[in-house]
Every structure is written in structure tokens, then in C-alpha cells.
Amino acid sequence: MATGRGSRYLLTIGRWRRSFGIAPQFRALAALVPGVSHVDNKSDFLGKRPHRRHPGILQLSCVRLPQALAEAGQLLLLGSAMPNMEKQVQALTNYLWSRHLPVEPEELQRRAVLLEKKILENADSCQTEKHHEEILHALRRTTYHWQELSYSEGLSLVYMAARLDGGFAAVSRAFHEIQARLPEFQPQTLMDFGSGTGSVTWAAHSTWGQSLREYMCVDSSAAMLELAEKLLKGGSGSGMPCVPGVFFRQFLPVSPKVQFDVVVAAFSLSELPSKADRTDVVQTLWRKTGHFLVLIENGTKAGHSLLMDARDLVLNGKEKSPLDPRPGFVFAPCPHELPCPQLTASKPLACSFSQAYYPIPFSWNKKPKEEKFSLVILARGSPEKANRWPRITQPVLKRPRHVHCHLCCPDGHMQHAVITARRHGRDLYRCARVSSWGDLLPVITPLELPPSAQDAQDAPES
């Protein structure tokens, strides 16, 4: 039974439930309405714009590569005359998606100790050398063999065909969030670590246009840098670049004296050989950050876990740069700085998002695709100024007269909210119904309500 204060969390579906015959276990789930209350109208958007354009809407429509970039990519691929390009693209795509992080020495040692204990329990203790061979064989069989990718001219072209469009879509979605929530922010400088084909530069230029006057692209592969420069120049080594002010380097500048308004590492941290290397790079990138640090990886458990490590490293960093002592906070996607509830759940899930895009037009690339990715955007300054609305972390389920939303909330918990017009008001119901996976839901939680409003909400319905 619901008691007193808890009664406000109950929802009666009534005639809908009787007509459709919901199973008892699903009735209990549908009756739960976690801590969502009324629509947050501090920005006074109600009455000025339709609900489908509420300020939490952040999803982009299907992303398309800039025409100059798509044509340059086509020209380079047609001129390469590489055999079986479609098969090579598919093989590299599958490999990059299924790739794991390298196993750390400490974890390898822990596995060896467990294997040794298991083998010794069931074997003759005199055969020490044989036991060592068994342990090594078992480790080789069960341990992921991570290898560093070395991008030659040919592999760089395959990577471009496989990842240019999807990478552009993911980065465009991240930049769109910054622009939509802070339209007054006009960055002038950008640094891209692990720049690859230069998709970050193109996405930034598409988002902020002429406000950006300097792009620093850093990649250890000379072949990748050469390819990125050709793409900027229409597919040739000569000519004027389509995006001015782009500079290329093979090594990450470590001096904290020069900062960039936006620093990006897209699908790059997972290419580093160890956790120590990732720690050093993230700390350097944060020192180089003037306003926003954007980190993007595959939407897998490995990618999400890696990003949460980087997030915690920045938030818990003891060292403060004397040149920029401003603290960091999470701008997106988390509405809090607490441990990720997706990772601490009994069955951990990757916090990921999806962006539709049109691929480079080739015979095997005709239909729109979806890029599934994880991201974290860290910002310098005070989190009090940030919007702390709950984030929708799964596709919204629209049902007759109610909507299911899975939310990551400002208190650091996941909530499954069932929103109805009767219980939560027409405005919040309409906002929830037009929202999508990845959007923010503009709500005031019960804890944020003034005492008079809370008392009214606690009162039983007649």
C-alpha cells in the first residue's frame, strides 16, 4: 500500500488497464511514477513555442556530410583503385566496434594468480614447470590481445570510408548540444587530439562557422594528417582549403600556457596502450581546455567505462593549474557529478546515444545509418549555472494516454517515470511525448517545489 508522502508516486491507468488486460507484473511497473512533478517553465517557453520545440529538445535530424567533404572523400576513394573496398570497410568497422581496452599488468597478474590456484588444487604439486606452461597457455587463450593500429596510406583510406561519416555525426551531435544550450558561446580556437580524417574540424566549422579562426589537429599518423589535409583541399594536395586556419601536428603540445576554447578527443583515448597513458593525456587535454572538453567513444561498455574514468579524473583532480584554477563540472550528458548509476547497477549498461546520418554515397552506402556513441562534455566554471534537468537515456515509449521515460536524474539515480496529463499536467505530458532518446526533460522534481506546492501535491486525489 502507498502511505502518506509516497501516495503521490502512484498512477491509476483505469479503463485503459481494464480494456487491454495488462499482466500483473507489468501493472506494478506501470504504476510507479518516480520523482517527476511539473514542467519547468523558468525560461518562459510555454505559450511562445510549441511543445515539440521545448528547450530540452537536443536531437538532430539525420546528419549529412558537407557537400565539399563528401565529394572529396568520393574522389579520393575512386582514385585509390583499392580492391574489395566494401569488404575492407566492413571488416575494419566490425574490428573497431568490437575492440576492447588493453589488459593492464595488474589485471593480468590477478588472473594468473587465480589460474595458478585453480590448477594447483587439481594437480600434482611436483610438476611446477608444467603448471607454469598451463597457466601461460590459459592466459593466452582467455586474454584479449590488444594491438596498436598503424595507419598506412591504404588503411587511412579504408578508415575514412568506414568512419568519416559516423564520426562526423557523433561529433556534430555533441557540438549541437553546446550550441543549443549556450547559443551565446562563440569559440575561436579548437584542438582535436587524434584528429584522424579531420571530421571534428568539419563538424565544428558546420556548427560555429566563421567564429572559429584556429584549428589544431594532432595525430601521430603522418598518413592520416596528409589525408585530412587532402580532404580540406577538395581531394588533392593543392588548392585552397575549404576550412581556413587549420594546422597539423604529430605530437600533443603539453604547455598549459596556450589554451583552446574547445578541446576534443573523439574515438582516440581507446587507441592509447595503457591506463597510465590515458591518464596523462586526459590531464594534458584538461590543462589545454579553456571552456569545453569533449570526449567521445563507441557506445559500448568499454567506451562508456573509459569515459567515466576520464570524467572522474577531471572532477577529482588534485592538481590545479596556476594558470587556470577554475574547477570542472559535467555539462553533458550527466545532470550531476555523482557516480554513474548505469555502471553501479546490478547489471551495468553502457550510457549511449544514437545519431542518424547519411553515409558517403557509394553502392554499399545508400541507406541512412545510426551512429551509437558515448560521450562526456566537461566544462570549466560553476555547475550552478548549468541546466540540471533529467536526461532521457533510452528510447521514449509512447502508449495510450501515458509515456514511459527512463531518466538519469540530478540526484544520481536512474528513474523509470510514467507520465500522464492527469497526474503531471498537460504541458509536461506533451513535452515528454515529443521528446527523444538523449533529450533533456524540463521538469521540476518534488524536492525543488516550494513547500506550498509540495503540500498540494501530497494531498490525496478526490
From Swiss-Prot:
<comment type="similarity">
    <text>Belongs to the methyltransferase superfamily. Rsm22 family.</text>
</comment>
<feature type="binding site">
    <location>
        <position position="351"/>
    </location>
    <ligand>
        <name>[4Fe-4S] cluster</name>
    </ligand>
</feature>
<keyword id="KW-0004">4Fe-4S</keyword>
<protein>
    <recommendedName>
        <fullName>Ribosome assembly protein METTL17, mitochondrial</fullName>
    </recommendedName>
</protein>
<dbReference type="InterPro" id="IPR029063">
    <property type="entry name" value="SAM-dependent_MTases_sf"/>
</dbReference>
<feature type="transit peptide" description="Mitochondrion">
    <location>
        <begin position="1"/>
        <end position="31"/>
    </location>
</feature>
<dbReference type="Pfam" id="PF09243">
    <property type="entry name" value="Rsm22"/>
</dbReference>
<dbReference type="GO" id="GO:0005763">
    <property type="term" value="C:mitochondrial small ribosomal subunit"/>
</dbReference>
<dbReference type="GO" id="GO:0003735">
    <property type="term" value="F:structural constituent of ribosome"/>
</dbReference>
<dbReference type="GO" id="GO:0006412">
    <property type="term" value="P:translation"/>
</dbReference>
<comment type="function">
    <text>Mitochondrial ribosome (mitoribosome) assembly factor. Binds at the interface of the head and body domains of the mitochondrial small ribosomal subunit (mt-SSU), occluding the mRNA channel and preventing compaction of the head domain towards the body. Probable inactive methyltransferase: retains the characteristic folding and ability to bind S-adenosyl-L-methionine, but it probably lost its methyltransferase activity.</text>
</comment>
<dbReference type="GO" id="GO:0008168">
    <property type="term" value="F:methyltransferase activity"/>
</dbReference>
<dbReference type="GO" id="GO:0005759">
    <property type="term" value="C:mitochondrial matrix"/>
</dbReference>
<keyword id="KW-0411">Iron-sulfur</keyword>
<feature type="binding site">
    <location>
        <position position="340"/>
    </location>
    <ligand>
        <name>[4Fe-4S] cluster</name>
    </ligand>
</feature>
<feature type="binding site">
    <location>
        <position position="334"/>
    </location>
    <ligand>
        <name>[4Fe-4S] cluster</name>
    </ligand>
</feature>
<keyword id="KW-0809">Transit peptide</keyword>
<dbReference type="InterPro" id="IPR015324">
    <property type="entry name" value="Ribosomal_Rsm22-like"/>
</dbReference>
<dbReference type="GO" id="GO:0051539">
    <property type="term" value="F:4 iron, 4 sulfur cluster binding"/>
</dbReference>
<feature type="binding site">
    <location>
        <position position="408"/>
    </location>
    <ligand>
        <name>[4Fe-4S] cluster</name>
    </ligand>
</feature>
<dbReference type="GO" id="GO:0042274">
    <property type="term" value="P:ribosomal small subunit biogenesis"/>
</dbReference>
<keyword id="KW-0479">Metal-binding</keyword>
<keyword id="KW-0496">Mitochondrion</keyword>
<keyword id="KW-0408">Iron</keyword>
<dbReference type="GO" id="GO:1904047">
    <property type="term" value="F:S-adenosyl-L-methionine binding"/>
</dbReference>
<dbReference type="GO" id="GO:0046872">
    <property type="term" value="F:metal ion binding"/>
</dbReference>
<comment type="subunit">
    <text>Associates with the mitochondrial ribosome (mitoribosome).</text>
</comment>
<dbReference type="InterPro" id="IPR052571">
    <property type="entry name" value="Mt_RNA_Methyltransferase"/>
</dbReference>
<keyword id="KW-0949">S-adenosyl-L-methionine</keyword>
